[in-house]
UniProtKB/Swiss-Prot annotation:
Keywords: Cell junction, Cell membrane, Disulfide bond, Glycoprotein, Host cell receptor for virus entry, Host-virus interaction, Immunoglobulin domain, Membrane, Phosphoprotein, Receptor, Repeat, Signal, Tight junction, Transmembrane, Transmembrane helix
Name of the molecule in the record: Junctional adhesion molecule A
Site annotation (Microbial infection) Cleavage: residues: 285-286
UniProt domain Ig-like V-type: residue ranges: 28-125, 135-228
GO cellular component, one term: plasma membrane
PANTHER family: JUNCTIONAL ADHESION MOLECULE A (PTHR45113:SF1)
Compartments it resides in: Cell junction, Tight junction; Cell membrane
SMART domains: IG (SM00409), IGc2 (SM00408), IGv (SM00406)
Glycosylation sites: 185
One BP term from GO: cellular response to mechanical stimulus
């Protein structure tokens, strides 16, 4: 008898729990997207989905984030003026008639209850695919051995942004130079994201023709023109010659000052000394008893 009562109590508890779960499920709201990341070639139509449930009177808004920029695409179930010519609002999402690379970014679907506290949101990432263009490179024609040399590679059109591979004399340069015998004597840092290749320090074996390739997983990878870089020794002769010329010029300057001083071109009169000259002449012989002052002063 006791066992039967315990079973009935357990069944009753399970029934009550099921009712509570059902009521919670009915009262909850959900917002989701069937495709949280969308990749589409440029100039094609695309739909960003946003499904929701649990709202009796839903208010839908869409915003667009790209870096530090935020724009409103849809407000209160209506497309804003800046998008109304090429975007259509649907209860299940928004549709672009044609996308451009500037549309790449994150879109947030925000759903709230009109006059209520219920709220939900979902983010959809849109990547508009654009193949890379031919990259441009900045490579010095010569660089001094032992110094730092920086090579850059970039292209502006690829979406998503391109990654870069460097070549020396047609051979792929690994990210870690010590991993390949061909580059084991080099000391460089290669950044595939920025396209920067830094030699620090540059060695004689780094002389060669350099080019880079840009690829982003869409379209054909593009390769830059090859540019030759010469790793040259520091010109010690020029440095020695410059030092000798400096010493010679300094010697000439010192000699000139000494010569001018010795010739009296500099005033050597001491302060407080009179510049007047006094000439004194002895009296001439005269008769006894006659005396006359003959001193003369010249100014």
């Amino acid at each position: 008898m006791g066992t039967k009562a315990q079973v009935e109590r357990k069944l009753l508890c399970l029934f009550i729990l099921a009712i509570l779960l059902c009521s919670l499920a009915l009262g909850s709201v959900t917002v989701h997207s069937s495709e949280p990341e969308v990749r589409i070639p440029e100039n094609n139509p695309v739909k960003l989905s946003c499904a929701y449930s649990g709202f009796s009177s839903p208010r839908v808004e869409w915003k667009f984030d790209q870096g530090d920029t935020t724009r409103l695409v849809c407000y209160n179930n209506k497309i804003t003026a800046s998008y109304e010519d090429r975007v259509t609002f649907l209860p299940t999402g928004i549709t672009f008639k044609s996308v451009t690379r500037e549309d790449t970014g994150t879109y947030t679907c925000m759903v709230s209850e009109e006059g209520g506290n219920s709220y939900g949101e979902v983010k959809v990432k849109l990547i508009v695919l654009v193949p890379p263009s031919k990259p441009t490179v900045n490579i010095p024609s010569s660089a001094t051995i032992g110094n730092r040399a920086v090579l850059t590679c970039s292209e502006q059109d690829g979406s998503p942004p391109s990654e870069y591979t460097w070549f020396k004399d047609g051979i792929v340069m690994p990210t870690n130079p010590k991993s390949t015998r061909a580059f084991s004597n080099s000391s460089y840092v290669l950044n595939p994201t920025t396209g920067e290749l830094v030699f620090d320090p540059l060695s004689a074996s780094d002389t060669g023709e350099y080019s880079c390739e840009a690829r982003n997983g869409y379209g054909t990878p593009m390769t830059s023109n090859a540019v030759r870089m010469e790793a040259v020794e520091r010109n010690v002769g020029v440095i020695v010659a410059a030092v000798l010329v400096t010493l010679i010029l300094l010697g000439i300057l010192v000699f000139g000052i000494w010569f001018a001083y010795s010739r009296g071109h500099f005033d050597r009169t001491k302060k407080g000394t009179s510049s007047k000259k006094v000439i004194y002449s002895q009296p001439s012989a005269r008769s006894e008893g006659e005396f006359k002052q003959t001193s003369s002063f010249l100014v």
